[in-house]
């Protein structure tokens, strides 16, 4: 919402594989839905073809922000094809397809000054001291300017949940100190607490 408020002519390209963001969701944040291009996607290749086509037609002066919800939930086309063919084989093409997607989009995003926010999943490394790792392979990691891994705890009053305390773990950043932990508190009544992460 902040990007669209800052630039009157800005638009949001919203790629959706989880379908958890109906129009009412955008309206609740004060986002003008006529400035949102909502694109449902089913697989990595579909995202790649549409995103590259959109980026090819955007100029540096255009104010565009791109969101993907979620990369972690996207199958590869091969995985879908194998399912339709009733093949139960491991899909080794997904990480390769994601790496290709980010390899192709990164120059466009950088040269045209377009922010892209992508939701992804994490998994725990195997080992004595496992840590959360971003899924999807190295392409996502290397192309990113920032990678934040979010954790949360419930804020309760008795047994009633009043909101959440989020911790932003800065896994990678070109702008802030890596491995920082930034607390953000959000309550149902007041929203984001004004001084979260500052005190």
Kindly label every feature range from the protein language model.
Residues 91-197:
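Phosphate-binding/switch region of NTP-binding enzymes
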Residues 7-100:
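Conserved inter-motif catalytic segment of the P-loop NTP-binding fold
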Residues 3, 58, 109:
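Hydrophobic pocket-lining residues that define ligand/cofactor binding sites across diverse proteins
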Residues 1-7:
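Glycine-rich P-loop/Walker A and Walker A-like loops and their local beta1-loop-alpha1 context
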Residues 1, 62-66, 198-199:
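Generic low-polarity alpha-helical segments
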